[in-house]
């Protein structure tokens, strides 16, 4: 069943609003309205974002970060396996296992056992030549760091820790990913130079000797000679070494994607309210549709012992009607008391089907047992972070629809009596002056209301970044509570209602002028 309150209009979306431009006479206004058409001014507080961000899904930005961190873990393990499988050939160089086997007839310089004993000198004694063992060690070290960092990111995201749901956490992820990505890039380049000696031999003092030794493995004519396995693995890039190089670049790309999605997550957290972000999946729907017949029987049986609804029930029902303190709707008459007191089924429905409500109902204001609206406020901490409750209701937002169908019609009738259809250009000019004056007043009043709501939203986000024991938290909480009192005052509510009346008046005048312009020949 639909959970939208009865007679509730559809939600207003600023991006779907199409203004109804009217074309005034050029001889009267000089074409000014053609150049600057009057557009609706969407208010920050009256048009909240209705989009819900499901950050618990694997396809969401945090979910993609979890997937990428898991892939980095797998690629780091693969790099360990590939690089470790080639370390045995490097140990042979240092111990001189192949001795005179390198003393080929065409070498002419007696490389022999001297190469085996002086292999390490290439990397440290002469400079400009990368030791393969040092390059592999560097890549293994960076793979270990990436493995640990990715494991931490994955674990903190999967266990749904509170730290992983803050903007500061994703800022740390961005910084760590950038550092590790740069270091892995350097390690991969060094590894390429280390496992491919001919790539770094040009311009070095041992370039000609290395080319002479390794040339036999690059030409088909040398296949008949005795092939030393240690020298072969030194001169030729093994398949597992090539795989390690490719995995190194893939890790760099993965870290770049993590940075992108972490920045995207931070932007969404800054743009949307916390109540619009779902970090955990809400199981709010039953496995099977409810039995309607049993539900009706339970409701009918429960009406005997149900206490009568409180007198302020009209203020507690989540409907699009704004009730004033004197029981009127925006200065007009409201429904009679018998309308909502004669049927006790509405409170019973609220008690019987709490599990079939949609996600939007969990974002509605809560009510206490005595029927009063509970307005959350910031308070001094009692037991550290454990005593801090999650603010799930965006109480500093209101929707523009606060009048029911009957009250809107009555209000429209008043504007029709005050501003009847235009019959002459003089009357149109008078309407235009009233429209301009009302528009300026509406913008000024709307800006005043928006300042309060924007400040509430800013303080709400700042309080999550402060420790509850700090002085900054206490000062921000006091200011938050003060603004909540200002917003709950009668002066603020009267300004809000007057602002909505002004908007209705301006819309009516605009429609009258547009109708007159369309009727003109």
UniProtKB/Swiss-Prot annotation:
Bias category Basic residues: which stretches? 380-389
Where mainly found? membrane
What topology does it adopt in the membrane?
Answer: Multi-pass membrane protein
Q: Which cysteines are joined by disulfide bonds?
A: 214-235
| Localization, UniProt | Cell membrane; Cell junction, Tight junction
Domain MARVEL, residue spans = 60-267
Is Cell wall biogenesis/degradation tagged as a keyword? no
Stretches assigned to the Extracellular side: 90-133, 194-241
- What happens to this protein after translation, modification-wise? Dephosphorylated by PTPRJ. May be phosphorylated by PKC during translocation to cell-cell contacts.
Q: Which residues form a coiled coil?
A: 424-488
Reproduce the free-text note on domains from the UniProt record. Answer: The C-terminal is cytoplasmic and is important for interaction with ZO-1. Necessary for the tight junction localization. Involved in the regulation of the permeability barrier function of the tight junction.
Protein's UniProt name: Occludin
Source organism per entry reads Mus musculus
Q: Which gene encodes it?
A: Ocln
């Amino acid at each position: 069943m639909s959970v939208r309150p009865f007679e509730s209009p559809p939600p207003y979306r600023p991006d779907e609003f199409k203004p109804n431009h009217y074309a005034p006479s050029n001889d009267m206004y000089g074409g000014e309205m053609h150049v600057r058409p009057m557009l609706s001014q969407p208010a920050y507080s009256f048009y909240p974002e209705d989009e819900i961000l499901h950050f618990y899904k694997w396809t969401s930005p945090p979910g993609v970060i979890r997937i990428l961190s898991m892939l980095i873990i797998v690629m780091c393990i693969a790099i360990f396996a590939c690089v470790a499988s080639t370390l045995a050939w490097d140990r042979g160089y240092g111990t001189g296992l192949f001795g005179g086997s390198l003393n080929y007839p065409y070498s002419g310089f007696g490389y022999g056992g001297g190469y085996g004993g002086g292999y390490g000198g290439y990397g440290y004694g002469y400079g400009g030549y990368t030791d393969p063992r040092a390059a592999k060690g560097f890549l293994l070290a960076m793979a270990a760091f990436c493995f640990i960092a990715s494991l931490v990111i994955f674990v903190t995201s999967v266990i749904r820790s509170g730290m992983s749901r803050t903007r500061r956490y994703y800022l740390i992820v961005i910084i760590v990913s950038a550092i590790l990505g740069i270091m892995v890039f350097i390690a991969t380049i060094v590894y390429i130079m280390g496992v491919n000696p001919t790539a770094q031999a040009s311009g070095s003092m041992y370039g000609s000797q290395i080319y002479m030794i390794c040339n036999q493995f690059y030409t088909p004519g040398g296949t008949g000679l005795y092939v030393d396995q240690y020298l072969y693995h030194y001169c030729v890039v093994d398949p597992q070494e090539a795989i390690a190089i490719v995995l190194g670049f893939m890790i760099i790309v993965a870290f770049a994607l993590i940075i992108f999605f972490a920045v995207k997550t931070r932007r969404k957290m800054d743009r949307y309210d916390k109540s619009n972000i779902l970090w955990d999946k809400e199981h709010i729907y039953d496995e099977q549709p409810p039995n309607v017949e049993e539900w009706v029987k339970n409701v009918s049986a429960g009406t005997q012992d149900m206490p009568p609804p409180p007198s302020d029930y009209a203020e507690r029902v989540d409907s699009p009607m704004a009730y004033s303190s004197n029981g009127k709707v925006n200065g007009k008459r409201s429904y009679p008391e018998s309308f909502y007191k004669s049927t006790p089924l509405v409170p019973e429905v609220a008690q019987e089907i709490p599990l079939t409500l949609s996600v939007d109902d969990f974002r509605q204001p809560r009510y206490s047992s005595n029927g009063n609206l509970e307005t959350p406020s910031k308070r001094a901490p009692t037991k550290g972070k454990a005593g801090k409750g999650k603010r799930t209701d965006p109480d500093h937002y209101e929707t523009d629809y606060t009048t029911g169908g009957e009250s809107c019609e009555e209000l429209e009738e008043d504007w029709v009596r005050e501003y009847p259809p235009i019959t002459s250009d003089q009357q149109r000019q008078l309407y235009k002056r009233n429209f301009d004056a009302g528009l300026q007043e509406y913008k000024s009043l709307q800006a005043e209301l928006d300042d309060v709501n924007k400040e509430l939203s800013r303080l709400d986000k700042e309080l999550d970044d402060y420790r509850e024991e700090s002085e900054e938290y206490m000062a921000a909480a006091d200011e938050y509570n003060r603004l909540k009192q200002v917003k709950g005052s009668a002066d603020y509510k009267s300004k809000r209602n007057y602002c909505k009346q002004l908007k209705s008046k301006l819309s009516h005048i605009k429609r009258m002028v547009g109708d007159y312009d369309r009727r003109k020949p």
